[in-house]
């Protein structure tokens, strides 16, 4: 009996080891979060790439899907107007979050995707009404000066800055074709943070 229990525990350990290996394959940590409110569903698929040797600690890619059964009806899919158009624009949203640690609050005035230096960039706040997202060309980096009054301060602890970059469906399709993701962030202090990693996006059903 004890031998059967031992082999059973061993198989469980092997399975868990393989599971966590697959979850962290190529430095990518995968999470899936499903939230329900009333009859609606929000599904977030989150892919996190960890960095070890710089102030840039994480690159996080998030695909968010909003499912509203009422608007999924065939008649609504073909409909026009503010509500229908907003839902079409927001039902699937793609976003990169860049997490930078420093002893200061940072702003980021520029984001450059190598190969797409001429991309059309907007700089409006991420919480603006949905009609802004319908006008999204390539990607939005938010207002770089939203915390400007704090830029001069230095803190005796680590400040975890997050830059959220929302990208359009069309631009997502373009960067998905790249072999490598080469991205440069430029802060309000003209500090450059460079990323050069294998493009993990084509490996997943996004």
Swiss-Prot record:
Which UniProt keywords are present, listed alphabetically?
Cell outer membrane, Membrane, Signal, Virulence
InterPro entries (UniProt xref): BptA
Instruction: Read off the Pfam families from this record.
Output: BPTA
What residue range is the signal peptide?
1-19
What's a single GO CC term here? cell outer membrane
Query: Which family is it part of?
Result: Belongs to the BptA family.
**The name this protein goes by in its record:** Protein BptA
Q: Name the encoding gene, please.
A: bptA
């Amino acid at each position: 009996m004890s031998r059967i229990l031992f082999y059973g525990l061993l198989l469980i350990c092997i399975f868990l080891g393989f599971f966590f290996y697959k979850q962290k394959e190529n430095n990518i940590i995968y999470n899936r979060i499903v939230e329900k409110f009333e009859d609606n569903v929000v599904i977030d698929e989150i892919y996190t790439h960890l960095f070890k040797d710089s102030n840039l600690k994480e690159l996080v890619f998030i695909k968010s899907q909003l499912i509203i059964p009422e608007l999924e009806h065939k008649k609504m899919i073909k409909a026009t107007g503010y509500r229908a158009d907003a839902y079409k624009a927001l039902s699937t949203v793609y976003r990169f979050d860049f997490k930078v640690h420093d002893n200061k609050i940072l702003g980021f005035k520029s984001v450059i995707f190598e190969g797409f230096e001429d991309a059309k960039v907007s700089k409006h706040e991420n919480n603006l009404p949905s009609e802004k997202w319908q006008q999204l060309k390539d990607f939005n980096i938010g207002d770089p000066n939203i915390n400007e009054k704090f830029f001069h301060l230095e803190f005796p602890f680590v400040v975890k800055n997050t830059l959220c970059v929302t990208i359009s469906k069309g631009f997502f399709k373009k960067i998905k074709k790249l072999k490598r993701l080469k991205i440069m962030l430029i802060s309000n202090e003209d500090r450059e943070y460079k990323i050069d990693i294998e493009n993990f996006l084509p490996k997943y059903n996004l």
